[in-house]
UniProtKB/Swiss-Prot annotation:
This protein's pathway: Amino-acid degradation; L-tryptophan degradation via kynurenine pathway; L-kynurenine from L-tryptophan: step 1/2; Pigment biosynthesis; ommochrome biosynthesis
Subunit annotation: Homotetramer. Dimer of dimers.
Protein name: Tryptophan 2,3-dioxygenase
E.C. designation(s): 1.13.11.11
Catalyzed reactions per annotation: L-tryptophan + O2 = N-formyl-L-kynurenine
Matches recorded under InterPro entries: Trp/Indoleamine_2_3_dOase-like, Trp_2_3_dOase
Gene: v
Organism listed in the record: Drosophila virilis (Fruit fly)
Molecular function GO terms recorded: heme binding; metal ion binding; tryptophan 2,3-dioxygenase activity
């Protein structure tokens, strides 16, 4: 079967088919396979004590880094599209497509961990001494992914030093780190986008006011139902549960409470952005909110998959070196990695918690004709 990327069939002297007459590059030249396939330098081989599984270790991590590069490429393009005052529907569709691509890449990376686990702890010990002081903590691209996604420096777990210190005097790496910290992250850009959600305007549909009224009516109906409970302890339990729910809703309706939660690190979005996310969730069946809802869902998928990847990495490290040893780069190994599984590393934490504030479908404020027309004719 001929290569689908071939041109008119003209061959080089070695029998290879060029991509096209114009470019004049064969498959290996185009992909620079001479460099790519010659980049596996086994230190155990150089030491005249070759360890077979070191090759797998190198290949697996190089594959990770290649996919990290693609994720960064996608994130950067998405950030450019989001960094506009008005995002039309065609761009929203493209953003959704590229986020979905990142999701599929991350699924692949999660599934790649078991391949590395075919190596036993004893096999790993045979060449582990060659790795120091190298460490996965020194993966520049993974740090860039975290920063571009929206992991804040103050949210990071401290273990020995500032995370960027591991790059020493590497000016290129330090410049990339600073740029990723200073530029608008996906979290910041998505927040700005959500703040512009049509229907939040107080002089217009004023969704937030209507939502508060619906919640008050919903809770009042719950109280009336609880008061009819004939069993005293059951009635008191239901009333107590309703009061707890009222406090939960107060945390989103009271801006001061919300801001306190943001400062504490328990929330990420601004108050208005959270309103936009809730509105999109309620009216996701509306044509204009369909793609935005997909976008928010994909952001949660990305967060979830990165957490799954971290978890798989933690389990693999525990299998390979146990839970007491230091990592090859001097980090606290398993203990440090386990600490990164907390919600502090979940960038779009607020999206995961939206279900806390849902109300029954029949209690959702109905859209009036004005906002329906706005959702049909205006980009989000």
């Amino acid at each position: 079967m001929s290569c689908p990327y071939a041109g008119n069939g003209n061959e080089h002297d070695d029998g290879a088919v060029p991509l096209s007459n114009e470019v004049g590059k064969i498959y290996g030249e185009y992909l620079m396979l001479d460099k790519l396939l010659d980049a596996q330098c086994m230190l155990s081989m150089e030491d005249k004590r070759p360890v077979h599984d070191e090759h797998l270790f190198i290949i697996t991590h190089q594959a990770y880094e290649l996919w990290f590069k693609q994720i960064i490429f996608e994130f950067d393009s998405i950030r450019v599209m989001l960094d506009e005052e008005v995002i039309d529907e065609t761009k929203t569709l493209e953003i959704v497509k590229r986020l979905n691509r990142v999701v599929l890449i991350l699924k692949l990376l999660v599934d790649q961990v078991p391949i590395l686990e075919t190596m036993t702890p004893l096999d790993f010990m045979d060449f582990r001494k060659y790795l120091a002081p190298a460490s996965g903590f020194q993966s520049l691209q993974f740090r860039l992914i975290e920063n571009k996604l929206g992991v804040l420096t103050e949210q990071r777990v401290k273990y020995n030093q500032k995370y960027s210190d591991v790059f020493g005097n590497d000016e290129r790496a330090l410049h990339a780190i600073r740029s990723s910290e200073d530029g608008p992250s996906l979290l910041v850009l998505v927040q700005r986008w959500l703040e512009r959600t049509p229907g939040l305007e107080e002089e217009g549909f004023n969704f937030w006011s209507k939502f508060q009224q619906s919640v008050d009516q919903f809770l009042a109906a719950q109280v009336q139902s609880a008061l009819l409970e004939p069993v005293e302890w059951a009635k008191n339990y239901r009333l107590m549960d309703i009061e707890k729910r009222r406090e939960v809703y107060r945390s989103i309706f009271d801006p001061a409470v919300h801001e306190a939660l943001v400062k504490r690190g328990d929330r990420r979005f601004s108050h208005r952005a959270l309103q936009g996310a809730i509105m999109i969730t309620f009216y996701r069946d509306e044509p204009r909110f369909s793609q935005p809802h997909q976008l928010l869902t994909l952001l949660m998928d990305i967060d979830s998959l990165i957490t799954k990847w971290r978890y798989n990495h933690v389990i693999m490290v525990q299998r390979m070196i146990g839970s007491q040893q230091l990592g090859t780069g001097g980090s606290s190994g398993y203990q440090y990695l386990r600490s990164t599984l907390s919600d502090r590393y979940k960038v779009f934490l607020d999206l995961f918690n939206l279900s806390t504030f849902l109300i029954p479908r029949e209690a959702i404020p109905p859209l009036d004709e004005t906002i329906r027309k706005k959702l049909v004719h205006k980009s989000v």
